[in-house]
Amino acid sequence: IHKGEGLVSEVFDKEKIKKLSGNAAIGHVRYSTAGGGGIMNVQPFLFRTLDGMMGIAHNGNIVNANSLKKELEENGSIFNSTSDTEVLGHLIKRETGRFVDRICKSLEKIDGAFAFVILVEDALYVARDRYGLRPLSMGRLPSGGYMFSSETCALDIAGAEYVRDVE
């Protein structure tokens, strides 16, 4: 994982990008609205789960994050940031069943306007709040891969063709 504060061009240069490996990634540029700034709140967040590693990034605001965080902490969860994004990771870790079902059960507990991207070893999951208040668009890359973004201009910059909005 590589992350830092500042503009993308300040955090990543060609050398750092060359060192990255794999066929999937989460990128995130944060405008601090909840949880404050600082390196501890820079996304994506990485979680170790019984199923392996899980990365999460999100755009939006979880309005019941404080009450969920309090409940999770009372049950043993340890938070490493003040970001509301981290709440979803802890909720998913507490659920049982198939991974996709754990995500769905966790999202049912969250109130607010949001779009999430969740990356695990063999899959990428995306989700929006039940009212679709936060944008999330899907694009197809020239290589045949896919990307998701909260702004279609990011698809254009990456050379991806807009496919549709996530519902």
Question: Language-model features: where?
Answer:
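Conserved short alpha-helical segments that host acidic/polar catalytic motifs at enzyme active sites
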Residues: 1-166
